[in-house]
Amino acid sequence: MVTADGVILDHTGFMMRLIEAYAPGAQKSLVLGMAAGMIPRYLQRRGQQVAAVEINPNSLQAATEFFDFDPKGIEVYLEDARTFVRRHHRAYDLVVTDLFQGDCTPDYLLTVEFFREVQACLRPGGVVIINTYFDPANEIANDTIVATVSAVFPHVLELRSPSSAGLVSSACLVAADTPLSPEVAIAMADKDAMPSKDFHTLKAARLVDKQRLKNTRPVSDDHNIFSILFASSQLRYRSQFNQLPPNLLVN
């Protein structure tokens, strides 16, 4: 959703702020899951060389017809994200993952092996920004996602809304092989006007405490239990959407 003065109110606008904060000098970026195409266009406007990977051709069609997405100057690949990253090593300064299919991320795109493949795509000093969701009623599942990413990247920053009113809500992780500072996100909160949720989420940025996760097992391809861990959360998430007006388009 975009206001009349151009402020983006959903998770897309929040991810743009994270890009500005943690990858200001990126020259070549990869977007896995293009949704409405707003992130690839934003990166292109920043002067970057951009590749966008989307498995669903209907998403590309919808982005073009309804969200004014123009693929000119953007490398668009209709392909599975996982097969794409396997072929591109040391190629990108920034990788953005927004890999939702329906109301969840496919579980094979949440494993240690997948994040290792994403890590291999990065140039030295590169950053990954991961869009996901957290359920305040299911901290085991939340911690498992964080532990899985942390098993690959030595530095992980967690950004989740401190006041989600008990609802399943979007969250982001920033991951890198080089140190990250939550102070960068905190400073971004004071930079310009933004939705209240984004402000408080940036202010609550924290580095992942790996000691806290020492008893949480990362998920692998061979033992992928995310569909089980998130079953109750997905039901809660769907029930939230059932309360929306039927004519509202949710991206």
Please describe what each predicted stretch is.
Residues M1-V53, P57-F67, I145, N242-N251:
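Class I S-adenosylmethionine
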Residues L60-H89, L94-T97, D103:
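S-adenosyl-L-methionine
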Residues E54-P57, E79-A81, L110, A141:
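Short beta->alpha hinge that forms the Motif I/post-I loop of the SAM-binding pocket
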Residues D103-L110:
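Glycine/threonine-rich flexible loop motifs
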Residues A141-R160:
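Conserved Class I S-adenosyl-L-methionine
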